[in-house]
């Protein structure tokens, strides 16, 4: 789970930007999008191949 603590002198805008960056980096929206619809075996294969390429 992604959490952001807001400092005393920190604005909401900067905390929101940090939160969005952490969510994007964690891949939460990609997972939600993927789980929203049925994934065919070929789509699953393509997604995993793309993940392997990203890790290199």
From Swiss-Prot:
Record gene name: rpsU
Pfam families, sorted: Ribosomal_S21
Entry keyword Lipid biosynthesis: no
HAMAP family: Ribosomal_bS21
Keyword Cytoplasm: no
GO molecular function, one term: structural constituent of ribosome
Name assigned to this protein: Small ribosomal subunit protein bS21
GO annotation, cellular component aspect: ribonucleoprotein complex; ribosome
GO biological process: translation
Higher taxonomy: Bacteria, Bacillati, Cyanobacteriota, Cyanophyceae, Synechococcales
Similarity-based family: Belongs to the bacterial ribosomal protein bS21 family.
Keywords associated with the record: Ribonucleoprotein, Ribosomal protein
């Amino acid at each position: 789970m992604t959490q952001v603590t807001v400092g005393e002198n920190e604005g909401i805008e900067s905390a929101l930007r940090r939160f969005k960056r952490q969510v994007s980096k964690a891949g939460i929206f990609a997972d939600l999008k993927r789980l929203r619809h049925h994934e065919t075996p070929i789509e699953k294969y393509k997604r995993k191949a793309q993940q392997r390429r990203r890790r290199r």
